[in-house]
């Protein structure tokens, strides 16, 4: 069996500067748990042979294991990370690490640095879930193209409605937009004088039939889809 002995009972094993939890009058006591001393049953001294057997077993794992090293912190023992050169010796295929600034990324850990001052020619680095710079370009011409293509959609929708083709509701397209697009199209493409007179005759004929209670006869114009 092994015992925890006080420094007063075995003065030859421990220096006098290390204090224990046992009293000065007792021969056996509880030593400080931070510094245990293993004593052989015969009282011949500490078992240094077992400690020597444990040390090669720990070294057999190589330098990849973290080695506890006493630091200046008050918390106790801290763990030392493996060195880069030793890691590269066991893993030569891994490329060397480069700083984030060389890749065009801002370091999120450095809050004391100056803000990024980028011009229009240099895109601002993105910090969104691993997206690289330039993945989400914001173009100022997108709004202009969308506004320019909306009258074309209105005219196409009107033409399909006149031709009797079933249309699909366009999101964001209102009835006022259709009316404005039809008016702009009629102003940009005026009809010839004969066609205007025919339209006026049809309207007058329709009003006359409606006044007499008869159904008007619709005459199709040349070149129309009806």
From Swiss-Prot:
Main location group: membrane
Source organism of the structure: Mus musculus
Task of the protein: May play a role in spermatogenesis.
Localization per record: Membrane
The keyword Manganese appears for this protein: no
Family, as annotated: Belongs to the SPATA25 family.
Gene Ontology BP annotations: cell differentiation; spermatogenesis
Protein name as catalogued: Spermatogenesis-associated protein 25
Pfam families, per the entry: SPATA25 (PF15218)
Primary gene name: Spata25
One Gene Ontology cellular component: membrane
Positions of transmembrane segments: 153-173
């Amino acid at each position: 069996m092994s015992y925890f002995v006080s420094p007063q009972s075995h003065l030859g094993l421990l220096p006098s500067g290390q204090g224990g939890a046992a009293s000065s009058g007792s021969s056996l006591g509880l030593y400080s748990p931070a510094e245990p001393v293993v004593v052989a049953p015969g009282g011949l001294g500490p078992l240094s042979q077992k400690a020597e057997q444990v040390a090669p077993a720990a070294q057999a794992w190589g330098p990849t294991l973290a080695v506890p090293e006493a630091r200046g912190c008050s918390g106790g023992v801290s763990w030392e990370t493996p060195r880069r050169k030793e890691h590269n010796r066991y893993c030569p295929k891994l490329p060397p690490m480069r700083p984030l600034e060389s890749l065009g990324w801002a370091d999120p850990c450095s809050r004391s640095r100056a803000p990024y001052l980028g011009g229009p020619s240099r895109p601002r680095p993105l910090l969104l879930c691993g997206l690289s710079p330039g993945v989400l370009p914001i173009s100022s011409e997108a709004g202009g193209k969308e506004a320019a293509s909306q009258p074309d959609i209105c005219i196409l929708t009107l033409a399909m409605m006149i031709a009797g083709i079933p249309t699909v509701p366009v999101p964001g397209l209102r009835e006022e937009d259709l009316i404005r697009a039809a008016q702009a199209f009629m102003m940009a493409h005026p009809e010839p004088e004969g066609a205007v007179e025919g339209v006026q005759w049809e309207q007058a004929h329709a009003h006359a039939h409606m006044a007499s209670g008869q159904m008007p006869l619709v005459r199709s114009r040349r070149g129309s889809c009806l």
